[in-house]
Amino acid sequence: MLNNMSNNTNNITSVLTESLPYIKKFQGKTIVIKYGGNAMVDEALKSSFARDIVLMKLVGMNPIVVHGGGPQIGKTLKKIGKQSQFIDGMRVTDSETMDVVEMVLGGLVNKEIVNLIHQHGGHSIGLTGKDGSLISAKKLKHDIEPTSEIIDLGHVGEVDKIDISVINLLLKGDFIPVIAPIGVGKDGFSYNINADLVASAIAQALNAEKLILLTNASGLLDANGELLTRLDDNIIDGLIKDGTIHSGMLPKINCALSAVKNGVKSTHIIDGRVAHAVLLEVFTNSGVGTLITCNE
């Protein structure tokens, strides 16, 4: 028993010692975290994520959370008897579905995250991209390969412009912003936007130190299924050309590349199924995912 206690103490001491240089390095820096996947549905992972965010704030960082909520939207639609339809992984969003999206993302999911942060001693404010004109959106025009036929996805949008005024106001007040990826267009309509795209755009607008994307994978894997721990844009271009990066991971990689090519120091694609994944990635030498930087 004494040996076990000694080993545990040594492990804790090692982690704390290892984290100190990173705490100093990133004090006062802005880190945008896209929160999604298993980390949003597993109770233990939800709690560990909230604690990670609170600790980052306590040691002087400025974490900003952008969240998804696809499974929760699907569950609510099913309850009201409405079928979910997807094209190339994107939810077809008519006006009725958009009402549900706003209710679930802007209400249920957003406020649950805010409440979890509060439970662990943090101070956060939840908002959507419609608040303070944070996210100006435009309708997404999606074409299907190989015909290039333009498909109307309804209220599915992309980021047109980010106004960081409301975020800066919250950071100045020492709050943790928790943002639902809903924007408003010049036409006055609400649009549901992919949370990875929103997180990347906000990170770029703020010149953030880091963009962290939580996934249901270990990170970016090579052709043999081995984790690629560190990549730059040149290597990634090659991996896309040879087909190593494909399908569902490709849009996420494009978000990561867009960020590091436009002022964000680094992007991290990490395994949200690992407890305290955010802290392990930011505060340890080995991390728990793939670090992406720009070679320019």
Swiss-Prot record:
Pfam family, one: AA_kinase
Positions bearing the site annotation: Transition state stabilizer: 34, 252
Entry's Gene Ontology molecular function annotations: acetylglutamate kinase activity; ATP binding
Alphabetic keyword roster: Amino-acid biosynthesis, Arginine biosynthesis, ATP-binding, Cytoplasm, Kinase, Nucleotide-binding, Transferase
Annotated positions binding substrate: 69-70, 91, 192
Pathway as given in its UniProt record: Amino-acid biosynthesis; L-arginine biosynthesis; N(2)-acetyl-L-ornithine from L-glutamate: step 2/4
Lineage top rank: taxon: Bacteria
Any Gene Ontology CC annotation: cytoplasm
Gene Ontology terms: biological process: arginine biosynthetic process via ornithine; L-arginine biosynthetic process
Subcellular location: Cytoplasm
Reactions the enzyme catalyzes: N-acetyl-L-glutamate + ATP = N-acetyl-L-glutamyl 5-phosphate + ADP
InterPro entries, per the entry: AceGlu_kinase-like_sf, AcgluKinase_fam, ArgB, Asp/Glu/Uridylate_kinase, Glu/AcGlu_kinase, NAGK-C
SUPFAM superfamilies linked to this entry: Carbamate kinase-like
Statement: the UniProt record of this protein carries the keyword ATP-binding: yes
Record function comment: Catalyzes the ATP-dependent phosphorylation of N-acetyl-L-glutamate.
Family statement: Belongs to the acetylglutamate kinase family. ArgB subfamily.
Record's protein name: Acetylglutamate kinase
Organism: Ruthia magnifica subsp. Calyptogena magnifica
